[in-house]
Amino acid sequence: MLFSSLFLLPLVALGTSVNALSTITQPLANYKWPTQFVRSGEANIQVLVQGAGPTVVILPSYGRDGGDDYNYFTDSLVDAGYLVLRPQPRGTFESTGPMTNVTLEELAADVAAVIDTLGGAQAIVIGHAFGTFLAKVSSVLYPEKIPAIVVAAPGGIELPTNIAGMPFITGNTSLPISDRLVALQTAFFAPDHDAHIWLDGWYPDVLAMEHAAVEAYGRLSSHWGGADTAQVLEVIPADDPFQPKSQWNVTTNLYPNRATLKVIADASHALFPEQGKAVVEAILPWLNLQSSKI
């Protein structure tokens, strides 16, 4: 089963180019994070903007926002001298835009508009889980804007069938908490980690939108490493059931000249709230090397 089948499963009980005139509005007052908005076609994307330096864009996981899960990571990159942009998916926080019949190309255009408007037209893109899918597609469509990508907890190119549908349980807020918690512990958190912290933060409408976009896009295997010119860092949680150990070396074997692998111990698919410091230590040296080239 190919990786894309994770996103092609039925979504039970859940409901192409950058706009040449992408514009920015003024920051909101008294918001939790420094915030600006970027126009992308019919969408108005809220972006959390922190730091200064080479630009890094963070794309969150399936059906979730790019807020609290990435605060420690963002603060660490800001302290290291980076401008960190966290565009919020349509339907999360105050990002707005069409939510039906949305394509991955349109979501990638949102990313590109943010890079053009706030990031000096070039950025390293870090995707987490579903965000790795969008990072890869964005780099294929906009290789001149995205010279390097980090794919954190990307899942394998083949998935265990009993795991592939778990996001549609954890993200279905109409289900009993006990059912969702079992799915979270099984698929997203390593043993002895508290899965309760991810009971909140899900957006069923966003999950449905992203699912439909990936379903329409189809298989990703033809550009598993993003654009042919992109440098790739793959960060694999050692306990991630979405990427069994037999799948750990697929990316580096396919792209030995441009892919690097790091494994994070005692972490599963959620990764960032589980092992924040280890994630920073795995990514930052590679990020420093890549950012020195742009």
Predicted features along the sequence, with ranges:
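Alpha/beta-hydrolase fold catalytic core
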Residues: L2-V56, D79-Y82, N288-I294
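Conserved HGGG/HGGXW glycine-rich cap/lid loop of the alpha/beta-hydrolase fold
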Residues: A43-E94
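Catalytic active-site module of serine/aspartate enzymes centered on a nucleophile-bearing elbow/loop
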Residues: R258-I294
